[in-house]
Each structure stands twice: as C-alpha cells, then as structure tokens.
Amino acid sequence: MTGSPVRANRPPGRVAAGPCRVRHVPRKACGRPVPARLLTSSGRTYAPGMDTSRLLRTTGTVIAAAGLLLSGCTSGGLGEPGAAAFSPPESGTAKAQPSPDAAALRPYYKQKLTWRDCGVPGFQCSTMKAPLDYAKPGSGQDVDIAVSRRTATGPGKRLGSLVVNPGGPGGSGIGYLQAYAGIGYPAAVRARYDMVSFDPRGVERSTPVECLKGPAMDKYTQVDQTPDDPAERAELVAAFKEFAAGCEANSGRVLPHVSTVDAARDMDLLRALLGDEKLNYVGASYGTFLGATYADLFPDRVGRLVLDGAMDPTRPALELNRDQTEGFDTAFTAFAKDCAKQPDCPLGKGGPDAVGARLKEFFRKVDAQPVSSGDPDRPLGEALATTGVIAALYDESAWPQLREALSSAMNGDGSGLLSLADSYYEREADGKYANLMFANAAVNCLDQPPAFSGPEAVDTALPSFEKASPVFGAGLAWAALNCTYWPVKATGKARELTAKGAAPIVVVGTTRDPATPYKWAQALAGQLESGTLLTYDGDGHTAYGRGSDCIDAAINRYLLEGKAPEDGKKC
C-alpha cells in the first residue's frame, strides 16, 4: 500500500485480475463466455468487462492499498468562447482563477478532430489540443488530449455522443471505452449514441504525468503502511517524498494543470468538437466528481448526465479518506459474513469481528515474515497483501478469488494476492506500470489540500480511522499522508456543487459500496439543484451495467428518452 491523494484512489497494492474478478465487472458478464483479453489502442491489454479504474482512489486508499470557463454570449451553437468574460458559478473552484480570454480560446474550439483507425476493430482515435493553463490560453503551451469513439451502430435516430469516464482519477477512458463501454453498454444505447471517451490530461495517451520507473514503483508499493516504530515511520515518509520528487522531476510542467476543473474544461472543448450542443455523459466513481464539476461550470450545456457511485464534493480530504475507510469496512463485513458460510473460507467461522481479527493476524504475520509470491523481488508482505484484499472488496464477484488467494497465502503461496495487487496497480507482467497511480496522486493532491499536515496529525486521527475499520483503518490513515509532501500547492478545496439551471442529473448510489459510501450519493443528489437519486440496494462499487435490470432500465430510459427516474427510486 503506497499512496496517492484523496479523492478517487486506489491503494498501492490493490488489483483486479481479470473478468469476473475485481473492479468493474458487469455481474451478468460472469455468466457468459468472453474473450480472455482485449488489446486496446495503447497496446495495453484488458480483461473484457473489467474496468480497471472505476475504483475511487483517495489519498488513503491508494496509498493504503499499497493509497470552463467559456460560457459564451455568441451565436455559436456549440458553445464556442464568446466575447463576454467567463463567469464561473460561485461554488466552483474556478472562481478564484483568472477568467480566461475568450478570443485566445477560440482557436481551440475551432480545431477539427481528424479520426483515424485505432488498430482496434470498430473504434477510431483522434487527438485534440487544449491549453496547458486555461488562465493563459494564448501562451503557446498546450497539452494533447487523446480521444476515441465508436460510432452509433443503429438502428434508430442518432442522439449525439455519449462521453463515458471510468473513474480514478487517472483511469484511462480510452482503455475503458475500447475494452468495455464501447462493446458492453446496452445495445439500445450504443445504437443511438456515438460512444466516446478520452484520457484526461495527465493520463496515459494524453500528455501524461510520469513519476517512477518499474523497479522504483515495485519498491514503493511494498513500503509498510502501518509503521510500528520510528524507523518504519521515517521509511514511509521518505517513500512519499521520493514519489513526489519523481513526479516533479519528470512532469513538473504538467503538475500544476491536471486538476478536475482543468479536465472539465477539456470535456467542454471535446463536446464542442464532437458537434454536440449539450454534453451527454456517464461517469463512474471519481467520474461523478468530474461530471458534477462540469455541470457546475457549464449548467446550460448539460444534456443527460448519469453520475454512478457518487462522491460528495463537500467532504475535505480527511473526511473523504475516513468515509472510504468506513466503506471498505462495510464491504469487508459483507465479505466476512459470506466467507463464514463457505466450506473453503480460510478465515474460519464466526461473525465479522472474528473473521476480521483473523485477517488482521494474517497481516501481522506477513509483516513480520513475508511469504513467497513467485517473484523473488516482491515477496508478499503486509502492504501488498492488504492491497490485494482491498482490490477484491470492490466487487462481490471477486470474493471466491479472494478466498482462494488468502488460503494459498496462509499456506505459503502469496502469488494470488500479489496478482490482485498488481491488477489494482495496473502493473504488467514485464514490470511496467500504467501511469494511473501517478495521475491519481497528481489530480488528488491538486484538487484538495492534504488530509494531514504531518505524521503527528496522523497519530491524532488514528483512533477515528481504526474505529471506522479495525482491519484497514491504520493503513488507510497513513496512506492519506501522501499529499503532505506534494511539490505543487492544491488549487481546489471541498465545496458544494449545485449546477444551478442544469437539466435533470441522475445520481446513482449503491447501499454497500466500498469505495463511494452511499451517503455520498445522497449528499451529491441533494446539492445538485436538478439532482435525482437512484438507489441500488446491494454490494459492489457502482451499479449501472452490473446486473440490476431495475437500475439498467431506469438509466437506459433516461439516456434514450430523457425521462429521469423519480427522485428516491430504489432497486
């Protein structure tokens, strides 16, 4: 478990390893044959139906597992920047930033997307330019934003583009589109919409944030996240500092400009270049924060927005991490109850407290004496073991795999938990990492001030984290220390997003979601002036496309007919 900041993160050391395993696997997909792997346009492979980034990674979760303004008064029908100065909503982060020059932004809105073959059947790719700094759009410094689409399949009248974001922050929208959304969303939706996604600035195919190479990342993800003495505490702090220094050395130009507000501005640029007057969007996990930020900045350009697995933007970093810690405990309780009923449960019988105590004892043992994992440079210690467990808690379809991996680890074979952790970190077999963890930290640390001022502040907060989760609390608290040493000062802060004047926005919450607690969905739906809450009473992270006919029907009707479900509807 090694970290990243607060928002939608993953802990260093959590992974998903294939169809019907961790992350975002549609529940029904587990009952039908699927190809073993899909090759996306970056050359990275994904298991079909597996969203490797819909995990909400907050400062603590990423570490722990290891832890625009262009509203225009113009006649341009696509919301091109006009002569009037941008006036952001009062609740938006952008309020304190200089208003961008509309004339300087116009060339960006006038560019054309040139579509080319991606090398992935059915998909096209393109690249758009966006200003590095929206406060200085005429400076000549730009970033590349990679885009992909699959055109509407028909039959039926085309409704425009549907932009999807899998979460993160740091998740590759293009990888998600090509491996899942573009082929796995309901056929009726794909028939009427061009399915579109992009890698946000800082992510993979777009101008990326880079921090550490593979061997250094291997070391980083093994750092003990529950320091037992001053030496281990110093080692953890040093790891955070080394990670931050690597990001500054390799990506210093980009780091100040990868906030969620920047990404929302890029999304409005994309909307215009796609030829859409309104943005139609489905965002999961952290993608709900991106979508809500967009709506708050551009309420008049909101089309049909679905925010699934919602975040509460009013929660400061400390509370986000503590809430998520509580969410993982809720998910673990559900796993523990199920495990105790299974004949192959390696944690024995009894209630969640007894099962949790045995898991905690296992973590203590591998902390003192790591077990073999098949990789001599990465034995399974507490950090990687914890990440592997947390990764599997994102989806109940991964519980059988988790039981098997725990059983093997308790008998001296840590390869199963290591595989889960590697999947969470998006580590390939050749030792290379996707840049998800780098982008995750960069976005989270920019969006909010750090959760803690230093190790002493963690000490103060530990009791509340351990109360939230006796098993995972300490590690997730220490993981949230990551942003304390970030080289760039945060530009955002916790705030209410209201999107005053926007069309109806559907907010989806799952009652036992481990990564985005249900109360966050309730809060966001209440903040958004036009928000309507759709509830799934169940387990797992996010709800759409994961096996609930009730949820899918409500969202499909909204996307296809524009009819939002009744506020408070439960499935």
Label each PLM-derived region with a short phrase.
Residues G356-A503, G547:
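Alpha/beta-hydrolase fold active-site neighborhood
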Residues G3, R7, R44, D51-T61, ...:
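Catalytic-loop region of hydrolases
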Residues A515-K519:
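Conserved alpha/beta-hydrolase "acid-adjacent" motif
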Residues E210-T221, T293-A354, S407-D413, Y424-E428:
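A catalytic-pocket lid/entrance helix-loop region that shapes and gates access to the active site
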